[in-house]
């Protein structure tokens, strides 16, 4: 749910988000399946942050807007893991912003030794 720093707006997630008539569009084909299970856990590939401080030496820094956390709720996603190679693309600030966005939506998260329940 985001873009890398050099990606054009054209054909980007941001463009799809801006043009979507319904925010539920992104998970519409799996929402019913996710809603019927006990818990849906997904990988959150990049942080949800407005930070512009990219990690040095990283070829592709991925991030999404913190508002995208709401899309997870609309998709009946209850938990995310973001213990992956892009978690620190925007430093610790990016991780903190992600945690805040997830907590505001009531989404459980896990990364490294941190679990938000």
Give the predicted meaning of each segment.
Residues 1-117:
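Acidic, metal/ion-coordinating pockets
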């Amino acid at each position: 749910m985001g873009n890398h720093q050099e990606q054009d707006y054209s054909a980007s997630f941001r463009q799809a988000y801006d043009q979507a008539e319904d925010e539920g569009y992104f998970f519409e084909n799996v929402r019913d399946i996710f809603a019927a299970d006990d818990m849906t856990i997904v990988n959150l590939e990049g942080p949800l942050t407005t930070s512009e401080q990219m990690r040095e030496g990283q070829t592709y820094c991925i991030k999404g807007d913190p508002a995208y956390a709401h899309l997870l709720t609309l998709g009946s996603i209850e938990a995310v893991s973001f213990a992956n190679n892009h978690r620190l693309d925007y430093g610790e600030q990016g991780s903190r912003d992600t945690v805040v966005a997830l907590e505001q939506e009531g989404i459980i998260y896990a990364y490294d030794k941190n679990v938000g329940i």
